[in-house]
Every structure is written in C-alpha cells, then in structure tokens.
C-alpha cells in the first residue's frame, strides 16, 4: 500500500469553532486560556480524523489562530519594530496586533499588509523584511503542538512553510534590499527548528515551497540549492512540497535538491509526472497530489488507480499519495450538508471525505483492497457517470445565447473622454469625489433578521421591510457624513458572491461549507454545477429604493463575473472561461435593468481578477483575454452617461495594468493604504486613462485613520495621477466593521477630501440633477 498523508487540513472547525473563539477573545468575552483550549480541541479533532481515516501520517503544524505564514514570521522572530520589542518569545497577542493592528494587550499599531496567497482566495500576512534584520527562534508553539500530537500517539509529519517561499512572500521595506541577502539568517533558524524537531522524535518534515511553481529568477533558483544543501545536514527527512501548478522551468532545480522526497501537484499539472519520474533519483520519495485539494468534486478512484498502477509498479514504497495541496481551501465535512439535493451531494467530497478517498486509493494500489474499497470506487465511478449524464447541467437556451455574442457586445458606445464628459454633466461631482466600496456594517440585527427569515420566524414581507429600514439608515448616515456618491449598504446580502449565486440558475449552496479567507473571516463559496442564467432581476429593487431616498447619485453594486467564478467551486466539465462568459451574460442583464431603473453609477467588483492569473507568465495572455472579455461583456450594455466603476483589492497591479486599462471601467478603486500607496508607483510609467480611487484607509484594521494620514496618502497619489481623475474612498467594503468604527473614519475621509479640494482647486458646488423620486 502506498503511504498516504495530507499537506494540511482545515483549521476553522466544521462549525467555525475557531472563528467564534478568536472573535470572542478579541472582544474580551473569553480569556486567552479559553482560546488556547479551543485550539487544542480542534487540533486533536483534526488529527484524530486523519488517524481514523487510516492515513499513514498525521500532519502537524498546519494550525494557526490567524495565518500560517504569520506563524512562521513569529517563529523566526520577524516582528516589525512598530509592534515593540517582542523579546525572546513572540506571544499570541503580538501576532494578532501584526494581523489586525490591535489585540487585547499591547499598543495598537498599523497592521501588516495582507494579500492573496498565490492564486487562491486565502489571505496571508506579508512578512516585512529590513536590511540587517536579525532572526532567531522566537516561538515554542510548533514544538508544543508536536508534543501534543505525539502524546496522543499519532505518527507525526510536521509541515512548515519553506524558507525560500517565506522570503518570496515577504516584502523588502528597506530601499535597495535584496530579500535573498537575508536568506542565511533565515536558514540558520530553520536549521535550529529541524534540529529540535528531530530531538522530539519527528522523522519527516514537509517544507512547503509553492514558490517553485512560479517563474523564478536565476538567483532564486541558485538560492534554493544553497539553502537546502545547508538544511540537509539536519536530523529529519525533508519532503519538499510544491503545489498550485507544475514545476515548469524549476523542475531541474527542485529534483536536484538534497531532500528525501518531493510532492508535486498532479491535478493542476498532470503532464509533469512523466518528466519527474524520468529524473527522480532512486532514493527519493515521490508524493503525488492526485485528489483535488481546491475543489469539491468527487474523484474517480478507479480511474486514478488505473493511471497510477504503473507508477506504483515503478516506485514501490517510494510512492506517496496526497491531495494536490492543503485541504485548507475546501469545506470541512460533507456529512453536515443534510439539505443539499441528493443527486448533487453524491457528486461531492469535502475535506473529511477526501481523507477517505485517499485511503481507498492507497489500498486499491496495494494488496490490501477489500470489498469495501472496491465498493467505494464503484460508487465514485457511478456518481461521475450520473453527473455527466444529468439533465440539470446543460441548458439549450444558454448555449444559444453564447453563440449569439459578437464583438459589439463587448464595446461601450464612446471612448472614455466622451463618456466622462456626459457623466460629469449628469453627476455634477466636486473635485476629489468621495464614495465607499459598497457594503456597510452587517450588524447583529441584520444577521438575526436573515436567520429568522431562513428559519421561517420572519415572513418575506417583514424581512423586506427590515432591510428597507437598514437601507434608509445607511443612506441617511452617508448624507450626514457628506459622501458624494452613495451606496445602499448591502444589508440584504449575506456574501458578495453567495447573494448572486442564490439567484442564478446553475448554482448550489451549502449550509456549513465554510472556508477560511483570512483570520476569523470565513466564506461559504457556492458550487457552480451547471449552465448559468438569470431568471429575474437580483438587485434592482434595493438600489431603486435607495435612490428614491436621496438626491445624490446612488451606485448599483454587482460582483463581477471573474470574481463570482474565482470565489466559487467551479464545475470541471468545461473550460472555466465558458462558465465565466455565462456568468457575464447573466450580470449584463442586471446592468441593463439597473440603468433602466435610473441608477446613474454601477460598480462591478472584480477583486479576484489578479487572483485568477496563472502562476506562470506564459499562461497569462490566455487568461487575461477571456477575463477582460467577460468584464466588458458585463459592462458594455451600459449607456455612455452611466458611470461604470470597478473595485480591486489585495492586488499587485504593475504586471497587468495594460489588461486593467482594457477593462475600460470609468472609475477603478483599489487597495493601497496598507502598502502606503506603493501600488501607485506603476502609474509613473503607465498613464492610466480613466479615473481612479486609491484606498485611503485600511478597513481590515479597527483603528481610525487620521485626517492628516489620508491627506498625505492622497497627496502621494496626486503626484502620479491628475487630480481631476482622483476619487477618495476606503480600501474595501465596510461589512466587517462596526458603525462606531465606520462613522469617524468616513468623517475623517470627507474632511480630508475637503482639505484636498482647497489645496488643489476651488471646491465645486454640487448641482443635484436627480432630485428625490
């Protein structure tokens, strides 16, 4: 039988126990001892799940109260100076302050930058790197968890982000710093970590190096060789884990490293297996990621067993089996989904079920397969056949509409300068117009109303009335604060993707299919199982009502097609581009209906546009072609006088600014405050033709930004972008904040805009052209 293991397991708990405990701790409702107790209980439960399934190794080190990359920063003592002297040990509250800006103890400070983890919807805390930075072993947490698992009798394999990937994910904060200048100091600490793990009796350590699936410069390839030649002297065996794609140009580098085994992703890049097998050294283990760690579809175990049989014959006991990547990216347990349509449920496998798939596959490849294993494989094959034949998946009318799409459907009526003239006449906005990104706080009352509606305790009519009250409250607050372009606040929306998916055909929803996005923030991605279409308008009545309450312009709020795709579990029986075009056509109808209802501005959020970018640059053009095509297909139905906004967050834009400009949105708002407007450096060499709103405060931190801080950020922006094309706005939506935090921050933002108008030009008087309706 092949050795089975996972690269990582979801840490949040099947019922989001970790979320509830951490948020209770932040609010002072429980103490740190209670929080730690919850962590121990979850770890024990997750380790036991792996053991009960029959895995050969139990993976330890994947747990984090906030983020596993942040855990490594704490382990290395890489704490930015603004958080004070962490001393010899980085405590839990210090990591929370790094992540959130504040914690129950310690002084508040600006939170560390947060961005997407490779091409996933998981966010990590970016390590801050400084010249002459010193590293040292500064946390016992990993070793304590190993002791916990060994005390429970588990066969422990430790997982840890590798030293090169940790540096690759970091950001140089000192001018001219080459991150590789810090490698020797980092590797020194890794050597100490491996030594202590060996002393604890650990045999295998999995070092995650997904940076190896990206295009690495030659000096980084050489750095891998230098670092791992030093680490090979340790007392433990090293499994180099790569995932999220194929090794590509780094294949020789990875295979020649002095490690005891290597893991490759055979879901994202099955074609790399042949080259790896041909060059694998005879003493090395090969771990194959053959169960999809990023999607929820059941695997065809019999087909996998047939494919892998020759590999098993060739490698024998050196063949390990695993998911393609950590199971962090899928929901915990399908057994909790008692309300899913039974046919669809048979097609799925969540993290807990993927453990079973893995073990059955291992037995099928060995000499231990029993009748139950053969039955499990037969059931999986039958489920796949049922899915392929299902009449719920394909719709003739969707296919016919896709065939009718032509070039004119992707083109606005006039170029931006002419559109801008018409929009300025219609909207009559001042210099440095202010707006928000869309959502306002989802209060306990809003969430209770949604729960009551689902439970039948609140009628649809009563729920509608409650949401109208919330919209009226949000509109009134915005008018009092003095914002220029308003939003309805999205009180009725549970999630920016789920809300739309619930109203589109071809989507299904879970009750407990939660996945960690960052920290305590969890999302419940929809499952796109079939052709997508829009039976009826989704947002129009809410935006139309909000506009009736004010003479100021109201923005309609839509989630863009690429983001809906990226933040869903997507069907794997057709190209993702085809599914995205179906979503774009559905949203196009919503844009047309919003415009017909008199909404003068429509925001089509695409925060996940860059997230979908392939990790290897040679694959970028194909993706960007269809992603831009889908946005334009959604937006181009709008008339010239309707202002189209888009929003992007957590993105490095330098390498795709051409594609972003090709979207041809009239206004783009972006996340820039955590990076201190560094993202705007791209505009020194690229003249973005349309309007832009660089975020002036970090909504992920509860700290209130000062007026001077926001003025300074906008002055930096004004050095790169003409002031007549600048907007003033937060980084992102305000859903996760409280009104007590939101109002002072927005008041300061409006005050900053007024100062900027005085400095850069005479403030214009609003001419309200719409009036109350």
Curated annotation (Swiss-Prot):
Indicate the residues that form the catalytic site. Answer: 700 (proton donor)
Q: Where are the transmembrane segments?
A: none
**Keyword terms, alphabetized:** Amino-acid biosynthesis, Metal-binding, Methionine biosynthesis, Methyltransferase, Repeat, Transferase, Zinc
Q: Where does Zn(2+) bind?
A: 647, 649, 671, 732
**Annotated L-homocysteine binding sites:** 437-439, 490, 605
InterPro entries the record matches: Cbl-indep_Met_Synth_N, Cobalamin-indep_Met_synthase, Met_Synth_C/arc, UROD/MetE-like_sf
Q: Which reaction does it catalyse?
A: 5-methyltetrahydropteroyltri-L-glutamate + L-homocysteine = tetrahydropteroyltri-L-glutamate + L-methionine
Binding site residues for 5-methyltetrahydropteroyltri-L-glutamate: 16-19, 116, 521-522, 567, 611
Q: A GO molecular-function term, please?
A: zinc ion binding
Look up the domain of life of the source.
Bacteria
Under Enzyme Commission nomenclature, its number is 2.1.1.14
Q: Which residues bind L-methionine?
A: 437-439, 490, 605
Single Gene Ontology BP annotation: methylation
* Names of the cofactor(s): Zn(2+)
What family is it from?
Belongs to the vitamin-B12 independent methionine synthase family.
Function according to Swiss-Prot or TrEMBL = Catalyzes the transfer of a methyl group from 5-methyltetrahydrofolate to homocysteine resulting in methionine formation.
Protein name, UniProt field: 5-methyltetrahydropteroyltriglutamate--homocysteine methyltransferase
Organism in which the protein naturally occurs? Alkalilimnicola ehrlichii (strain ATCC BAA-1101 / DSM 17681 / MLHE-1)
